[in-house]
């Protein structure tokens, strides 16, 4: 009974969400190239800035390891701006974006917050994002997971690496999206040297696995349009 009460109590704990997040998956048409995509956005970006309020960040994500890129994601961080996002989606279709790529224009407005922000200077032209799609294990939730998150953050802060972390709640299931952002192209070496082999790091990873299972992980190069 006590354990059930703990589960019920932990399920009541929710993060202090500060933004909404949408990932729009796209695929280039066979007769289109990345140059076409770049030209389209450079031609229209100022118009889209006017349509979408200042509280919105829009980035294009390309798979990191894939040299022949045909798939990409439009990532939009906003603040419950459903109407302006809908206006943007309508306008991008009016501008015949479908001549360049086919996209799943679904606006989910999943709630998110930044667990850790890296505020020191870094190369703004290089941002690498790892998106993990995760589900909580049975009897686990954000309330039980936040202890592990706090321990992870304390550890990462001591390493002082160019890294940010965001948490996005998945409305469609008992899950979340864990977004690692690396601000240095040598991120793999930095992680191996500072994080992967440490004893405390292994303990934190075990706690993570106890709370949740991540069913998909993808790494992208991110280019922020505005």
Language-model region placement:
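Short S/T/G/P-rich N-terminal loop/turn motif that feeds into the first structured element of a domain
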Residues: 1-202, 207-226
């Amino acid at each position: 009974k006590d354990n059930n009460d703990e589960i019920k109590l932990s399920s009541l704990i929710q993060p202090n969400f500060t933004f909404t997040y949408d990932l729009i998956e796209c695929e280039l048409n066979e007769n289109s190239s990345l140059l076409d995509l770049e030209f389209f956005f450079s031609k229209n970006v100022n118009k889209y800035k006017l349509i979408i309020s200042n509280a919105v960040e829009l980035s294009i994500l390309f798979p990191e390891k894939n040299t022949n890129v045909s798939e990409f994601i439009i990532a939009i961080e906003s603040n419950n701006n459903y109407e302006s996002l809908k206006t943007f989606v309508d306008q991008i279709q009016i501008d015949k974006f479908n001549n360049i790529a086919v996209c799943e224009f679904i606006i989910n407005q999943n709630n998110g917050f930044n667990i850790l922000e890296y505020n020191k200077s870094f190369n703004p032209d290089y941002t690498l994002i790892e998106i993990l799609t995760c589900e909580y294990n049975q009897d686990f939730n954000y309330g039980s997971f936040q202890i592990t998150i706090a321990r992870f953050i304390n550890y990462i802060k001591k390493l002082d690496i160019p890294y940010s972390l965001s948490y996005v709640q998945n409305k469609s299931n008992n899950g979340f999206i864990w977004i690692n952002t690396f601000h240095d192209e040598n991120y793999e070496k930095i992680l191996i040297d500072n994080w992967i082999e440490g004893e405390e790091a292994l303990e934190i990873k075990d706690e993570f696995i106890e709370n949740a299972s991540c069913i998909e992980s993808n790494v992208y190069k991110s280019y922020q349009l505005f």
